[in-house]
Curated annotation (Swiss-Prot):
Keyword Ligase found: no
DNA bind region: 160-216
Species annotation: Arabidopsis thaliana
Location in the cell: Nucleus
Name used for this protein in its record: AP2-like ethylene-responsive transcription factor TOE2
Length: 485
């Protein structure tokens, strides 16, 4: 069997005497050549004096070894003593709180050695407690403060800023923030710094002044004043509009978004959005613009009052150039708009909105008007015009050349009235009328003397439905569009 008794040899260089102390334990002979462990040896000068004998003790060496491993003889032991004169070994199982390895109260012999030590990290050196040092030689390390853990998770792996992520597909730095368990997109930016600024503004709005941000809170004093009256959704929209990309179908302009069909549209109510589009279309495209709303008086655009459009229709029916035919003409002037207020009419030109006291006028065709011509005041008709044979009446503005009317007998016995006038401006969009319409001259004509009528400032053009005496064929001929000459 192996003898595992451990010998502790205490050698003094000045006294040449050895005191052996047998200690029960398990260790290795750290000074022996066969089983030397250099990693557990620490160079130090052990200067410990026991019982005040400073004059007699100088350097003391403590050595642990197994008896069975001794095999060299006296010469090897003396060589080991000389080499380990300034060596101190490290204890594998140190005694807690600086207690002696052997009970010092039970033994008063000077061979008793305190081999326990405490490793205090001070300047990178190891401090031994010693037998006389006590607690004074110990260096207490101050407790380290725990690192503050972020409440919002770790920083982004692809950026040094919080809430910023770089996407290789788009090549932009995108900013996101978590709110109520959902990730809110704040926009894509060209630089990580701009994305971090957007995240900070959103974090301050969402979580208050105690939010974890990338920069100091003092940089956002002006932004805090501007965001005071805004909601979270409005702040997010503002940040998205300031971004450099439209990857999420958002525009840098307020109220504009990319539609599914591929165009940019306004994010508002349908009626107000259509009115805004119509206003812009009328202003930039004029009569050729297409309307999105029904022409109704309650849906008029009051802001378009300053838009000057020529929506008057001109119908020119040639009756010849003879002086007799010109003398037989009847001049009709402007008819007040208030005489026809309240009529329910329809118009084919969608851009010509119709209402009284508005910048737009009704554009009425024969089939869209009332058959009762007596709806107009009788003062506006001559005695011959009040007869049942009256067919058509054309009302125009005073600034345009006078229109002439001439009637002729038909085989059916009725009377048809034809109007002649020089060509006017181009017709309105989608009106169905051409620039000029031709009519063959007739042999007989009825002369209607001109009557001065009241002139108003608002222009308008009305075509009253022909009388029942005119055949349907003649009525269709009057309203059928003709190509320009």
């Amino acid at each position: 069997m192996l003898d595992l008794n451990l010998d502790v040899d205490s050698t003094e260089s000045t006294q040449n005497e050895r005191d052996s102390i047998t200690v029960k334990g398990v260790s290795l002979n750290q000074m022996d050549e066969s089983v030397t462990s250099n990693s557990s040896v620490v160079n130090a000068e052990a200067s410990s004096c026991i019982d005040g004998e400073d004059e007699l003790c100088s350097t003391r060496t403590v050595k642990f070894q197994f008896e069975i491993l001794k095999g060299g003889g006296e010469e090897e032991e003396e060589d080991d003593d000389e080499r380990s004169a300034v060596m101190m070994t490290k204890e594998f199982f140190p005694v807690a709180k600086g207690m002696n390895f052997m009970d010092s109260s039970a033994q008063s012999s000077r061979s008793t050695v305190d081999i326990s030590f405490q490793r205090g990290k001070q300047g990178g050196d190891f401090i031994g407690s010693g037998s006389g040092g006590g607690d004074a030689s110990r260096v207490m390390q101050p407790p380290s403060q725990p690192v503050k853990k972020s409440r919002r998770g770790p920083r982004s792996k692809s950026s040094q800023y919080r809430g910023v992520t770089f996407y290789r597909r788009t090549g932009r730095w995108e900013s996101h923030i978590w709110d109520c368990g959902k990730q809110v997109y704040l926009g894509g930016f060209d630089t990580a710094h701009a994305a971090a600024r957007a995240y900070d503004r959103a974090a301050v709005k969402f979580r208050g002044l105690e939010a974890d941000i990338n920069f100091v809170i003092g940089d956002y004093e002006e932004d805090l004043k501007q965001m005071a009256n805004l909601s979270k959704e409005e702040v997010v929209q503002v940040l998205r509009r300031q971004s450099s990309g439209f990857s999420r179908n958002n525009s840098r302009y307020q109220g504009v978004a990319l539609q599914k069909i591929g165009g940019w549209g306004a994010q508002m109510e349908q009626l107000h959005g259509n009115m805004g589009c119509d206003k812009a279309a009328v202003q930039w495209k004029g009569r050729e613009a297409a309307s999105l709303i029904e022409p109704h008086a309650s849906r008029m655009i009051p802001e378009a009052a300053n838009v000057k459009l020529d929506l008057n229709l001109g119908i020119s029916l040639s009756l010849g150039d003879g002086p007799k035919q010109k003398d037989r003409a009847l001049r009709l002037h402007h008819v007040p708009n208030n005489s026809v207020c309240g009529r329910n009419t329809m118009m084919e030109n969608h851009m010509a909105a119709a209402a009284c006291d508005t910048p737009f006028n009704f554009l009425k065709r024969g089939s869209d008007h009332l058959n009762n011509r007596h709806a107009l005041p009788s003062a506006f008709f001559s005695p011959m015009e009040r007869t049942p044979e009256k067919g058509l009446m054309l009302r125009s503005h005073q600034s345009f050349p006078a229109r002439t009317w001439q009637g002729h007998d038909q085989s059916s016995g009725g009377t048809a009235v034809a109007a002649t006038a020089p060509p006017l401006f181009s017709n309105a969009a989608s009106s169905g009328f051409s620039l000029s319409a031709t009519r063959p001259p007739s042999s007989t004509a009825i002369h209607h003397p001109s009557q001065p009528f009241v002139n108003l400032n608002q222009p308008g053009l009305y075509v009253i439905h022909p009388s029942d005496y005119i055949s349907q064929h003649q009525h269709n001929l009057m309203n059928r569009p003709q190509p320009p000459p």
